[in-house]
């Protein structure tokens, strides 16, 4: 009466015994330590010293880390709304549109340092830049670019190039490694062949 059941149990026990024997005979796999988690790259690790600072965005005064422009070719320009060179806004915007896809960014820094030609509030400057002049490249809050109290960015640019701005719309060209690749006086327009050639060299 119990014979079929006993036979079934014997049949089941054989593979189990064999499996146990095989398991015991295999060498234990060496434990592999888990790789330590990668720490996120800090801005200082990937950002040139020139860009390791913050400025307030013109339109809303939100703090912006300049490290976001690391790895790009950057044209830094001190601007003014009531200057004989103010018409260069259109040329700078055209330059930005032409080369943006290849990695160029134009950064505008309004300044009242020369002839008090940028006297307005941030809101007034923003309205003139974005609505009147059609600027789409990044603009920052009013900045001191020469003399006492000048921003560390402009101090570094002047030191690296050997030339401080003499008037509004001075242009510094910075390469992808954060090195100053050129300094151009106000009279050098955005479509000047010298500026375009310098940009092409570092793109």
Language-model features and meaning:
Residues 1-9:
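N-terminal secretory signal peptides that target proteins for export/translocation
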Residues 31-67, 87:
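N-terminal "domain-start" segment that seeds a small globular fold
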Residues 51-52, 141, 173, 203:
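Terminal helix/beta-alpha structural elements that buttress the NAD(P)+-binding lobe
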Residues 69-74:
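Proline/glycine-enriched tight loop/beta-turn segments at coil->beta junctions
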Residues 78-82:
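Amphipathic alpha-helical repeat scaffolds
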Residues 85-150:
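Structural microenvironment flanking redox-active thiols in thiol-disulfide oxidoreductases
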Residues 152-155, 159-203:
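Thiol-/selenol-based redox modules, centered on thioredoxin-like
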């Amino acid at each position: 009466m119990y014979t079929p059941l006993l036979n079934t149990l014997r049949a089941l026990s054989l593979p189990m015994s064999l499996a146990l024997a095989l398991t015991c005979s295999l060498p234990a796999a060496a434990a592999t330590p888990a790789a330590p988690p990668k720490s996120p790259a800090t801005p200082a690790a990937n950002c040139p010293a020139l860009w390791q600072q913050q400025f307030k965005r013109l339109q809303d005064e939100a703090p912006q880390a300049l490290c976001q422009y690391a790895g790009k070719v950057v044209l830094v320009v001190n601007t003014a709304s009531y200057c004989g060179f103010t018409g260069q806004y259109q040329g700078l915007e055209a330059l930005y549109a032409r080369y943006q896809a290849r990695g160029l960014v134009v950064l505008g820094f309004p300044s009242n340092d020369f002839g008090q030609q940028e006297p307005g509030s941030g809101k007034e400057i923003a309205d003139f830049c974005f609505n009147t002049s059609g600027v789409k490249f990044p603009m920052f809050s009013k900045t001191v670019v020469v003399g006492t109290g000048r921003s560390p960015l402009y101090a570094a640019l002047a030191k690296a190039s050997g030339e401080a701005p003499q008037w509004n719309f001075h242009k510094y060209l910075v390469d992808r490694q954060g090195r100053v690749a050129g300094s151009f006086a106000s009279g050098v327009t955005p479509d000047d062949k010298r500026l375009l050639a310098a940009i092409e060299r570092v793109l």
